[in-house]
A protein has these predicted regions:
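Conserved beta-strand
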Residues: 13-16, 23-33, 64, 134
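Walker A (P-loop) phosphate-binding loop of ABC-type ATPase nucleotide-binding domains
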Residues: 43-46
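Helix-to-loop junction immediately C-terminal to a conserved catalytic motif
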Residues: 56
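Conserved ABC transporter NBD signature motif
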Residues: 64-71, 81
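ABC-fold ATPase nucleotide-binding domain signature/coupling loops
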Residues: 67, 124-157, 166
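C-terminal portion of ABC ATPase nucleotide-binding domains
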Residues: 133, 189, 211-239
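Catalytic Walker B motif of ABC-type/P-loop ATPase nucleotide-binding domains
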Residues: 170-174
Length: 239
């Protein structure tokens, strides 16, 4: 891995803030020991996704520190920092390219590894049913012969993309598009089985979907208002 064999990356946010014109996130303080699965919950606009994009280095914080195994994010080269995270965000758009090109770059293409990722994400049956398999184009508006994917199948492709990258820290933004409960449950359990021995963050709107997480942090109004285990938060009357 990017950390010289360290797959259990401890994450720490120290007084992290982000100022926009009319919005300030934080200050956020959160410690996740290596190997923790943490749920981040809160309403839309509560700051969860912004916090995670700060953690991934996609946004720069206004103040505060991010530590990975005690080392400041500022002390990493941008490439080595980027390689620490596999993140699946809901605002991701598939490009009008082949399925394979949407999952990995040409220089990184490994067919065996790609199909292992499809398998773990539960989408290999669909890919194998297509005449051109992973070389099938996506996006019907651009290519007449492109494959159609349901909301649940797109989620699985996003999960396959994160699995293919296989970074030490995995982040999954809960599907905002309504998936049926069975499809949603399948995404949780596949995510859960894949993140064994990794540090993982699961972004959700509901406490109930984070029952599998070791720790849950609750966002409200751009602040971290409480954190604990699923049971502790239920006991505290968490929403």
């Amino acid at each position: 891995t990017a950390m010289g064999g360290l797959n259990m990356n401890a994450l720490e946010l120290q007084g992290l803030t982000k100022h926009y014109k009319d919005f300030t996130l934080g200050p956020l303080d959160l410690t996740l020991p290596g190997g923790t699965i943490c749920g981040l919950i809160g309403e839309n606009g509560a700051g969860k996704t912004t916090a995670v994009k700060l953690l991934c280095g996609l946004y720069y914080p206004t103040s505060g520190e991010i530590l990975i195994n005690g080392k400041s994010s500022r002390d990493f080269s941008s490439d080595s920092y980027f390689n620490l995270f596999s993140a699946v965000f809901q605002d991701y758009y598939f490009m009008p390219m082949t399925i394979a090109e949407n999952i990995c770059t040409a220089s990184d293409y490994d067919r065996k590894k790609l199909f292992a990722a499809f398998d773990k994400a539960g989408i290999s049956e669909k890919i194998n049913s297509l005449p051109l398999k992973e070389k099938t184009y996506m996006i019907k508006d651009v290519y007449k012969d492109a494959a159609d994917f349901s909301g649940g199948e797109k989620q699985k492709l996003l999960l396959a993309k994160a699995i293919y990258k296989n970074a030490p820290v995995l982040i999954l933004d809960e599907p905002t598009a309504a998936l049926d409960p069975i499809a949603e449950n399948e995404i949780y359990s596949r995510f859960n089985s894949f993140v064994q021995n990794k540090t993982a963050i699961y972004i959700s709107h509901r406490l109930s979907s984070c029952a599998f997480c070791d720790k849950i942090a609750v966002f409200d109004n751009a602040r971290l208002v409480e954190h604990g285990t699923h049971r502790e938060l239920l006991g505290a009357g968490g929403k």
